[in-house]
Amino acid sequence: MSFKLNSFVAAALFTSLCATSLPALAADPAAALAALQNNVQSLGPNGEKPESASTITLSDTELAKIKAMNATAAIVFHYTGNDWAKAQTAGLKAQFAKMGIKVIGVTDAGFKPEKQVADIETMLAQKPSIIVSIPADPAATASAYKAAAAQGVKLVFMDNVPKGMQAGKDYVSVVSADNYGNGVAAAHLMAQALKSEGDIGIVFHAADFFVTRQRYDAFKKTIKETYPKINIVAEQGIGGPDFTGDADKAASAMLTSHRKIKGIWAVWDGPAEGVIAAARTAGRDDLVITTIDLGENVAIDMARGGFVKGLGAQRPYDQGVTEALLAGYGLLGKAAPPYVALPALPVTKKNLIDAWQTVYRVPATNKIKSSMR
């Protein structure tokens, strides 16, 4: 899971732009899913058009210059307790090592803005050349990031940018998965599993979190505009920090109040685990769940032929590599695109093993492999 960006205003702008600039989606879920992997549908937090991550490169000469700088980097997370953050860290560290850049710290704010501000201040005391980060709150953390920029630190952001900061001036760039595209993918996967009809529920993130808002907007818009026989009959927001437990309660209430519900979408894999728990408790072995983010627990459920029939996956390892390369752009004073994105990856049981390798750059875990039926 990745998250947090500007505001619902930015999200609304994004949704409006998508409505006018994107082609109409196909009514056939399989065809629509195939098309998703060839383009990025998300726009940046300020409406920027995406630049492909494949265009971000450094020459041998540029790498040599960076190595001679003996630069250091800090990685400041909003939260590290998931596979997404671990893969991001792995990608960042691997690419930084190739660039001769030492990682001096990785921090976890536990989704608390005040903790992240303290983490930034702690890292700044060590005078890093680079900070790669995802803000826990775009407004509450902005002053700390501005202080880092004023100190001359090269900032690269994951998914989200602090309020009042400008690309090319205050930070190098922001790198994101195609979160809107992954929301679209989850909608088509839901339709595919339900044969394009039935009642469904939505468990969304009840916070000013641009990335999760993109997912929600995309899922809901795609269902409403593309599948007229699928009815969204219940929606419930969750605020955390126990997202799995909150989703369990939300889904349980939906299953009790709307007994004809055939499917529930959860905004990322942690909440999806809560929906799985609710379905088990309710004895709803027929419930279809789709989500976003390829975590091990939802992958195991999918491998077993369980509740999770499909999900949209990010590419966090490659995202980390791209962020490290862009940090190199910052050190060199090389012009960088303001928003860089990686395409969505629809995942079902059929391509699960290969998708895990694509997402994490390591083979699927033994638990996943042994769960395949």
List each model region and its residues.
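Gram-negative bacterial Sec-dependent N-terminal signal peptides
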Residues: 1-25
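A residue-level marker of the well-folded mature domains of exported/periplasmic proteins
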Residues: 4, 25-373
